[in-house]
Amino acid sequence: MTPSAGLGLKSQHYGDAIACDAEGLWFEVHPENYMSAGGPRLAALEAVRARRPVSLHGVGLSLAADTDPDPEHLQALKRLVDRFDPFVVSEHLAWSTHRGAHHPDLLPFPRTRAALDRICGNVARMQDALQRRVLIENPSLYLPLKGHALDEVDFLEALATRTGCGLLVDVNNVFVSAQNLGYAPETYLDALPAHAIGEIHLAGHAPDPGGSNLLIDTHGAPVAEVVWTLYARLIARIGPRPTLIERDDDIPDFAALMAERNRAVAVLASGQTAREPAHV
């Protein structure tokens, strides 16, 4: 597939998604929302997939947990992969399960050598179960953790090298983390291994409603201008990559999302001459 820009598929936009004839448009879904045996949601995704490529962006495998991924979850994900043939499957660099309990968030962890070994094992298990390469997304961070042995870019690069996985770069996450933890987002993005980047996410953020100086990765606002600037800088270095406009809260009409998507298409077109191709 020629890299272009897509949208997160929302139930209120099923009809628009099926009817839209925009060139190169694709849609991303959270597979956890489609793991039922049937029903109207799966039927709608079938109708969209008949016209458009789709990607599956998981939120529930808890790859940074201290246990193996849940085998039943992996089996359900494999059934969706077989059914919809997504052009990308991705997951988060985070944990959300511990001692049998599930936490409804994507939580951080100390980037130790032991954590790298454990997560490499879990990513390998995911790829083996799905029989395909997956992409792993960088997290959004809010407070410093003690115990880091590796910086985040080095951790991600080692993960990609050891497992053969690719990277999903969420530019908004990079900006939010950089603002909250006090580093330059440009330095982070410039250090990422271009060959490993298989997809990019763009989303909105907001100030902490509690009044702190933190930024929160809300997915509830348009992509900020500073994130667009960082995105253009990244594309100028690495060349075009499939790019998603993420919106999970305060969702506007389809036309407003398409306007953001079309802006991403223009940035991708400007990066066609970059020299570092993706290995997706």
Curated annotation (Swiss-Prot):
Residues that span the membrane, as ranges: none
Free-text disruption phenotype from the record: Not essential even when cells grown in the presence of its inducers dichromate or cadmium.
UniProt keyword Ubl conjugation present: no
InterPro entries in alphabetical order: MbnB/TglH/ChrH, Xyl_isomerase-like_sf
Induction statement: Strongly induced by potassium chromate (K(2)Cr(2)O(7)) and cadmium chloride (CdCl(2)), but not by inducers of oxidative stress or thiol such as H(2)O(2), paraquat or diamide. Induction by Cr and Cd requires sigF. Probably part of the CCNA_03363 to CCNA_03366 operon.
Record key words, sorted: Stress response
UniProt entry tagged with the keyword Repeat: no
Annotated family: Belongs to the UPF0276 family.
Full protein name: UPF0276 protein CCNA_03364
